[in-house]
Amino acid sequence: KEAAFGPALQPYDFIYVDDLIEAVYRLGFKETNKPFYYIGSGNPKVLKDYLIRIGELVGCADKVGIGVREDDGVKYTMDMFDNSNLVSTIGEYASIDFDKGINKTINWLKNSLML
């Protein structure tokens, strides 16, 4: 079955859960001077690129229906995914790139669901 998406042209960011936990852990030991920090990979991309790559990695690129649905109207900007304040506070924390994180997740799902 095809997964239906809008045009998926908005920026987006994915972070592997281990990197997220590392960032939160480090923040717990720091005196912070900001009201909030964006925790992300530091490498945001257009959502369409992520969706196509996931399709390729699971062997179903033809099932990624980009542009099948209307745009949902949600608009993000690249600057919303800026993690430089966090990196300057706790140092580099993201160590698992998108492909490696998605592959780890795919393998976990296969083992968990016995696919």
Q: Where does each model-flagged region fall?
A:
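C-terminal substrate-binding subdomain of Rossmann-fold SDR/epimerase-dehydratase oxidoreductases
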Residues: 1-115
